[in-house]
Each structure stands twice: as structure tokens, then as C-alpha cells.
Amino acid sequence: MSGNMDEAVSGNMDEAVSAGKDVRIARWVATIAGLLGFVLSVSIPLLPVTQTTATLNWPQQGRLDNVTAPLISQAPLELTATVPCSVVRDLPPEGGLVFGTAPAEGRDAALNAMLVNVTETRVDVIVRNVVVASVNRDRVAGPDCQRIEITSNLDGTYADFVGLTQISGEDAGKLQRTGYPDPNLRPAIVGVFTDLTGPAPQGLSVSAEIDTRFTTHPTALKLAAMLLAIVSTVIALLALWRLDRLDGRRMHRLIPTRWRTVTAVDGVVVGGMAIWYVIGANSSDDGYILQMARTAEHAGYMANYFRWFGSPEDPFGWYYNVLALMTKVSDASIWIRLPDLICALICWLLLSREVLPRLGPAVAGSRAAMWAAGLVLLGAWMPFNNGLRPEGQIATGALITYVLIERAVTSGRLTPAALAITTAAFTLGIQPTGLIAVAALLAGGRPILRIVIRRRRLDGTWPLIAPLLAAGTVILAVVFADQTIATVLEATRIRTAIGPSQEWWTEKLRYYYLILPTTDGAISRRVAFVFTAMCLFPSLFMMLRRKHIAGVARGPAWRLMGIIFATMFFLMFTPTKWTHHFGLFAAVGGAMAALATVLVSPTVLRSARNRMAFLSLVLFVLAFCFASTNGWWYVSNFGAPFNNSVPKVGGVQISAIFFALSAIAALWAFWLHLTRRTESRVVDRLTAAPIPVAAGFMVVVMMASMAIGVVRQYPTYSNGWANIRAFAGGCGLADDVLVEPDSNAGFLTPLPGAYGPLGPLGGEDPQGFSPDGVPDRIIAEAIRLNNPQPGTDYDWNRPIKLDEPGINGSTVPLPYGLDPKRVPVAGTYSTEAQQESRLSSAWYELPARDETERAAHPLVVITAAGTITGESVANGLTTGQTVDLEYATRGPDGTLVPAGRVTPYDVGPTPSWRNLRYPRSEIPDDAVAVRVVAEDLSLSQGDWIAVTPPRVPELQSVQEYVGSDQPVLMDWAVGLAFPCQQPMLHANGVTEVPKFRISPDYYAKLQSTDTWQDGINGGLLGITDLLLRASVMSTYLSQDWGQDWGSLRKFDTVVEATPAELDFGSQTHSGLYSPGPLRIRP
């Protein structure tokens, strides 16, 4: 018996010794692996990388041919050039361009590029509009001159005429070497261009070292450190988990039982998210982010494609690399936005299954609270987080962090806290607004610190701290995977210097934008923040006033409010102040709504007066939301009701109705205060659950807006219809935008008749119209601006008058590539005495209309200019002068009988040349002829009109015309709507030369994409303006003729050139290496 007892005691002692040994091992493993993971992670930004180098050398293949090599950084690291003086001797008397880094005829070439030019008397070296050297041509052509050596680098730009000395001034007798020690004088390079022809002469060379500092990949050492850092961190977390288990508590289920319960709220929220995913609006920067993702693989890194000289997104933006991987499957919106849908579902599952129960049994058991959480989540998520912007992912990361912190607090374990730290770090690595996750960490900091202090007596300090350090720094293995600390600091310097990079004290701008009646402050975009604030502050007052509220967990509630307040604080330090950042509040706003619903319910807030006051607040918030337009970004706006006006019902603004109701509720609350009544069945009914009712109403409004848009737009473009067509291979807006490949095709044939001096266009007796009746500088779809604007068309630089008059004697340059030798023009503009002007053109034969003809030729178009009466989606009916299309049928005797007129769709802008659209669906099938009826009855010189003959254009879709292979500069606003077009790629510091440009509507292009992509800010227009000539093409949105969808421009080269062949190499550098600051200043 005693032997058995001895054996049992011995066995227990052995188990204890073994357990103690395991604990000691776990402590050492946690400490060593944690510190190793931490040290390796923080060393990764400093470890070496291999850089791909690229050099542009010219001449190529021994020929003096023009070559293109547009640098995304615009300026090289270094340029050296040697020009033998014999080249100058051999030039013709008028001279010419020896070489330039941009075509001499390119827009602002002298202002940006290097030009070595020879005139009749001088040899000039001009760099960025600075004369670096200017020497008499006879001296350079003389026998003493050997060669011209030019260098441009960080030390400055200099030109040395070897063999010559200066003949005057203080430096007379010294070498003929001049220049400036300015690193910003390095020229922009889009290639090498010359007037020279034939074989390359001996000694002529141009060599540019391209800035490829961001084109790097990790060395074997760095790759090993990254892998070991990740593995060490995982091992440290497993060891920490082993130490956590020493508390003897049974581990919670990974997925608790409550997760398996499905309710009606789940159905509404999940169904709403799914429907919105298909038909809903997208976010503002979707095109921007998608094109970054689409070009990343070819570039070798995630470049900020549209601005900042191609610098990388790091240290923020690892999420974009996920999208880059997804583009290997498809670029379609329905696929590429899938992370947002997944995050939306995760947010709801965590809210309903984890967060609400943690807030207390009163919240978890309240159906109204559950509805409030779901509907506020929906209402806040829908306007912001249905695209590619990362606010949805950040909101999810912050919620996961909060849930993990709460699990750490309830369990007393640190593994959930370590995972929360990792989650917060990765959330912060998405964008600076990821600070909301850091806010969740800080909100739970004190209870976590208590756990560490309590546990350190048993486990020691380092076994607990080291895994947390590794968990917080392992993100560096992702952020600095292919970049170094030097390149990331340079990218940050560039973004900060160019901007936008607003100071913390300008945070008021975010809220200012929110209250403006613009798309940034539209009805839907106000919901997230104002509903969160509406729930936050009353809850705060309740929690401060009452120390104990039955069924509400104070700790989690305070931490939730702390997250929201900390987020509002941290948002002050983000570099931009856009309202789309309010999408961060979607998840925590839903949780706050659930808590507030309980706190202001009749069971908790007994005062009828106070509940009525809160109802007044809810109604006021609704009034504030509706005191704006129902606007949405870009194509999401198509078909939405009240998308450019304040919503009304029966002529009364909805905002005014809610404001009146709010005032009534406030007066009722005041009456309850005076009468001191505490109970009222009517008040109880009205105040039972105002938050979910208000949120549900806003969700219905948003859903209805998009559903109405789909119905109105069908069968042309809407988000919903495009997403459905994507399953059958649809190409978004490219399927619905129609383009005229040649606007000279399709002009109608005039019927025989007696014509006046203007020919068939003028008819028999035109009054006040003349062939030259158009002001100077009237071009297609643009208005003259006093300040230079990037991205403008070549039409601005063409001669004001034609050298050779057109078919009817006009000297007016025509838009859209119209040929003056074939297309007449008549206008009423005059600087002399004004008169009433009238014109009825000859009848033009209208093609017979059948089903095939109806589909192939849906429009009659008149290219016109001036102030014209017409309709558009954006502006409704705009009054001006008359340019109608009159149609005629055959009478009993076969003569033409006028049968009616059609007023045009005119999308503007006024008074530019544009295409007036007359749908053939508004012309009866039996009409056989049409004519132009134009009247300018105004005696103001500013009111004038100009017209060309009618045409039935030959149309192709953009997808048919542009296709998927030609490189296209798609402005940042349009990329998601054109998933099948090929963006212009870049690699090794050089971009492709685009063939086309696709832009958003006129005002978005003018105010957003043209300015954002300006070359002075490191944008792509700095390349195209120098290298190419843009011409706008005639385009229309099918079946939505009054919609300004945007514009398509065709690029033509200034001079013929072929893509340059680059010389590649590789170099290995430490993480601290920098070739010097990238030139970002003019």
C-alpha cells in the first residue's frame, strides 16, 4: 500500500518537475524568440537591397533617330553629353536642334527640358529655361573648338566648350565653362530628340542615369531576416500562449456558440451589404487605387502612379499589394472590391457576436440595440466603404483590435493582447488613418498593463514583454519588404513637400467640407460621423451622471467611447482632411448606436422630457443630413434622384420637414419640463427606438437612390448594370461610351435647292451669319483660362486663323478633327453693330430608319458653339440662342412638309465647340429630311452661335475603338469604370507613351485630375504635355445623351520617335544608401 503511495507521490513530483521545466523553457523561448523577432524586424529597413539600374544612351544603333524614354521621376540622377564641334560646323546656316531631352515643339519644352540649339549666330545650351551657355557660333565652328561637354547632376549643370577660352569679362582667358551649382536644374527627360539625320558622328553622345532608387528587391540576407523575423514572432506568440495557460482556466471556444444563431437582423444586414455590393456607389479614389495595383507588378513596386514622381506608397499601403495580386484574376469591379464585402461581413459578425455581448446583457438582449448596430453599420458603410479605399479595412482592423483587447481583459491573458498589437500595427500600415486601431490599443492600455504587472511576478517581465515587442514590429517585414529606410524617407519627403500635407490645426476643414452641399458633404456622407456623434455625446453624459446602469458594462463602454474620441484626436494629424475618412466610424459607430439605444430607452432613461429631447436631436440630425444634395462620386451619380439639388417633396425641402419636426419635439420636451410629467404612453412610443428607425430610413434612402439610378439608366451604364454585365465579360463604361473614329464621316447630303452665299448650311436667306462669325480661341469642350492649365488640348496652340480658307471661305479652325475643306461653318459673332440673326439651312436627306439603323445610328449631331438653349442631366434646361433640328415628312404631292423640331441635348461647356445631340428616337420614323434652324435674337456681343451641318455619326464603343492593348492614360477618377483598358505602364523609371487619355466630366477634369496630375507635382501630365499633342474626340454616353460622362482624347506625337532601348544593370546598397534628393522643385 505504502509502495503504491510512494509511486504516486513520485509520479506527481515528476509531473511537477516536468511542468516546471516546460514553463522555464516557455519563458526562455518567449524571451529569446520575441527579442530575436523584434531585433530582426527593426533591422529590416536597414538591410541591403538589390537595385535595378537603367541608363539611357544616345545615339542608338548608330543612327541619329528620335527616341522616347519618359522618366517617371522626370529628372535623371545625372546627365552627361558630348557634342563634337564638327557637328556644329556641319549644320546648315539656319542651324537646328543638336539634341533635346524633349521635342523643341513640345509644350513648355524650354521651361522643363535641356535643349542644345544652334541658331544662325549662337550656340545655346538651355536647361529649364536657364541659359547655361551661349557662345558665338563662329567660335564653336572654328578650328580651336574640340567638343562641348555638358554635365547635369546634384552638383549643378555646366557646359564646357573644350578648346575655347572666354574672351571678355572678369574670366577672360579662362576656360569657356559656364553653369550653375543648382541641383534642381536637372532637366526633365522624355527622350532624346534632334534635327540631325543620318549616321551618328564619332564622339556624339548623350547618357542619362535614370533614377531607379525605388526599383529594388531584397537580397538573400534581407529575405532571410524577414522570414526569420516572422517565424520568431510566431514562436514567441506560441510561447506566450503556453504561459497564458498556466492560469488553469479552460480555454474559450474559438468560435462561441452564440455565433451560430441567425436572426432577422443578420438577414437584413448581410442582404443589404450584398445588394449594395452589386448596385451601390463606389468610393472616390477607386480608379486611383486600381491603376496603382494594375501597374505595380510591371513596375516592381507599388508606386503612387499619378503624383509624386512615382514614389512608393510605403510605409503605408500594404493592402494595395493585396489588390495587385487580385488583378491577376480580374480587374472587374465586382471582383476587385471583394475585400470590402468580406470586411463588411466580418464587422457585422464581430459587432453582433462579440462587441454587443461585451457591452453588457442589457445591450446584448435588446433587439432595438441589435437593429441600431446593424443599420448604423450599413448606413455608415455604404457611402464610404464599397470601393477600393481602405477605410473599410481599417474599420475592420480597429474592431478586431477592440475585440481582442476585450478578450485579453476578460481572460487575463496576453496572447489576445499580442494579437491585438499585431492587428493594430497592420491596420496602421494600411494608411495613417489606421491610428483608429492604435486608439483601440490605448483605450485598453490600462487593464492590459495591470495584467502584465500581475503576471510578471509569476512569469517574469521579458517573457511577457518580448513577444509583445515582436508582435508590434513584425509589420516592418511587410512594409519594408522591397524598400529601405532611405527610400521610404525620401518618398515621405516628396509627399510632404508637394502635398497635400496639412497641419493638425487645419482639421476644421474636414468638418467644413462635411457641411457644404457638395458631393463631399452629400446626404449619405454625413451619416457616419453625425450619427456616431449623436450617439456618443448623450451616452457620455449618461455614463458620467450615473455611476451604475443596470445591464451595461462600464469598462467596455468607456473603452468604446475612448476609441471614438481618440480617433477624432488622431485624425487631426493625418496629412489630408477629406470627409471619406469618416468611413472609419462605420464599425465603432454601429457599436456606439447599440449602446446609445439602450441608454436612451424608456427602461434606462425614465425622464420623458429627456427622451423627447433626444428625439428632437435625432430629427435635427436627419434635417442636417438632408440639407445637402444626394450626390455620389462620378459614375455612381448617374441616374440618382436629386443628385445635384436638395431633395424636395411637393416643393418642400425634406430638410425643412425634419427641422420642423425637430422643433416640435423640442417644444414638446420643454412642455414636459414645465409640467414635470414623467410618464406618457405617446412619448414612450415615439422614443422607444429612434436611432434604428432613423438609421433604417437613411439606409432605405441610399438603397432607393441606387435602385432608381439603375432603373433610370437601363440599358445604359449604371454601377449595378455594369456589375451584372461583368459576369459575361462586360467592360464597364467602355461598352456604353460611343466614339466617332472620324467626325468627318456621316455628314448628311443636302437636297437640291437654291442656296445663298453660305451654301446649303446657310439656306436661301441667312441673316447675320458669316463664315468667320466665331471669336478667336474657341476650341472643343474647353473654356479659355487666364492661368496656364496642365493637360489642355493642342487646339490652344494652333494658329488663330487658317492659312487657307475652308469650303465656304471660313478661316475658323474647326474642332474634333473636322476638315475645313469639307465642312462649312456659319456664325453670328461680330464686333460691329449687333443684329438679330436667323438661319434655316437647306434640307438634308435623313437615312431611312429601321431597327438596324436605329441601333447603329442613334443620333443626329450638329457641332456648334456659343450660348445655346439645350438640356443636360447636370443643368436641366439651359436657355440661350436657338439651334434646333427641324424634321420634315413627305406631303401628298411629294414635297417636304415641316413636321416638328427637336431641342438638343447640350452638355457644354458654354461657349466652346461641342456636339449638340438630337436623338433619332425623338424624330418620327416617317421623317425623310432635317435642317438646322438657328436664331440669335440677342443684341449682346457675348451671345452668339456658330453651327456646322448635321451629321449622323458612325459610332463605335470605346472598347471597340481603343481596345485592351493600347496604353491609355486613364485619369485617377475613371480607372474603375474602365477595367478593360490598358493603363500606361512604367518600369525601371520609364513610362510607356500613351495613345489615348480618358478623363472624367469637364469640371472634374478641370478642377481635380488636371491639377492633381500636373507635372509640377510629379504627375503624368508632365510627361504627356511635353511629348504629345492631345485632341478631344466626339463621344456620347449611349441612351443617356445629356450626360457628361467625361472625354476621350487621342494623343499624337509632336515628332516621330521610337521607344529607346535602355542599358540595365544592378547594384546592391545598404538600407541607408541614397543617391541624393529627387528633384521635385521647378
Curated annotation (Swiss-Prot):
GO biological process, one term: Actinobacterium-type cell wall biogenesis
Mutation effect (residue 289 to M): Resistance to EMB
EC number: 2.4.2.-
Main localization of the protein described in the UniProt heading: membrane
InterPro entries: Arabino_trans_C (IPR032731), Arabino_trans_C_2 (IPR042486), Arabino_trans_central (IPR007680), Arabino_trans_N (IPR040920), EmbABC_dom1 (IPR027451)
Membrane topology label: Multi-pass membrane protein
Superkingdom of this protein's organism: Bacteria
GO-annotated cellular components: plasma membrane
GO molecular function: arabinosyltransferase activity
Entry keyword set: Antibiotic resistance, Cell membrane, Cell wall biogenesis/degradation, Glycosyltransferase, Membrane, Transferase, Transmembrane, Transmembrane helix
Transmembrane segments: 28-50, 223-241, 262-281, 333-352, 359-381, 420-442, 462-481, 522-544, 557-574, 578-600, 613-635, 650-672, 689-711
Effect of residue 292 to T: Resistance to EMB
Main EC class the enzyme belongs to: transferase
Pfam families: Arabino_trans_C, Arabino_trans_N, Arabinose_trans
Note: This is one of the targets of the anti-tuberculosis drug ethambutol [(S,S')-2,2'-(ethylenediimino)di-1-butanol; EMB]. EMB is a first-line drug used to treat tuberculosis. EMB inhibits the transfer of arabinogalactan into the cell wall.
Family: Belongs to the emb family.
Function: Arabinosyl transferase responsible for the polymerization of arabinose into the arabinan of arabinogalactan.
Protein name per the record: Probable arabinosyltransferase B
Species of origin: Mycolicibacterium smegmatis (Mycobacterium smegmatis)
Gene: embB
